[in-house]
């Protein structure tokens, strides 16, 4: 999860239906996978972080980028579950999963909503995974795909326990994040290269389990009951999205 976001679920059996929101691919070992890919994730959120970085610079008290991200992300944890009736659409480009043909980043709030910094950034972080939830709900509700745990990876998870908790809340399942979560796609390609050279006849899954991820430090968070009401607000507003 970074500039874009996607989820890949290895399936026990083929999907019963066809859905434009779902891509059916395979693992390198040939196992069937349902993939939900969304074009937009953290770019709009990053733009807002940059705005507050500029403000800190103007105030004469500049804040280093990692510290600024941590400050704003952790503050989002103190926001209301419904983000004070603040809703963010982070579509810098079209988002087919949500039916949006063109990018139109926007935010909305009700006149009587509780608009503050914590709720704004909670809504911004929710927006990074809202379109993903639309596709995942198809798998959960129409295909009865069950998931015990999802492993989160990407820059969105660099600040420990924030996006991870919101994703667990939104998808209704446990989310684990490894120590290497902040590494990008180049790291994954390096693992495949290492497997090609050092696989020793093992399957890719066996190699990863025995050579790469064994003993890897990770944390797992469970969904909280009322944790993602803001994501529900975004879904209620779906017809509005389709009018972009």
What are these regions (language model features)?
Residues 1-9:
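Phosphate-binding/catalytic loop of phosphoryl-transfer enzymes
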Residues 9-238, 243:
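Glycine/Thr-rich phosphate-binding loops that ligate phosphate moieties of nucleotide
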């Amino acid at each position: 999860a970074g500039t874009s976001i996607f989820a890949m679920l290895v399936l026990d059996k083929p999907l019963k239906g066809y859905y434009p929101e779902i891509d059916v691919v395979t693992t390198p070992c040939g196992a069937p996978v349902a993939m939900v890919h969304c074009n937009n994730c953290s770019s709009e959120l990053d733009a807002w972080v940059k705005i507050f970085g500029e403000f800190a610079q103007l105030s004469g008290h500049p804040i280093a980028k990692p510290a600024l991200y941590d400050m704003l992300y952790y503050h989002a944890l103190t926001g209301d579950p419904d983000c004070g009736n603040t809703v963010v659409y982070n579509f810098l480009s079209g988002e087919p999963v949500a039916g949006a043909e063109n990018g139109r980043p926007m935010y909305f709030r009700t006149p009587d909503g509780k608009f503050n910094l914590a709720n704004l950034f909670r809504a911004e972080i929710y927006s990074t995974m809202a379109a993903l939830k639309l596709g995942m709900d198809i798998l959960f509700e129409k295909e009865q795909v069950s998931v015990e745990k999802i492993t989160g990876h990407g820059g969105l998870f660099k600040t420990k326990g924030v996006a991870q908790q919101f994703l667990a809340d939104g998808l209704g399942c446990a989310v684990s994040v490894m120590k290497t979560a902040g590494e990008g796609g180049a790291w994954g390609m390096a693992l495949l290269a290492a497997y090609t050279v050092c696989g020793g006849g093992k399957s890719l899954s066996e190699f990863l389990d025995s050579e790469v991820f064994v003993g890897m430090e990770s944390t797992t968070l469970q969904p909280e009951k009322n944790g993602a009401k803001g994501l529900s607000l975004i879904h209620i507003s779906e017809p509005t999205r389709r009018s972009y």
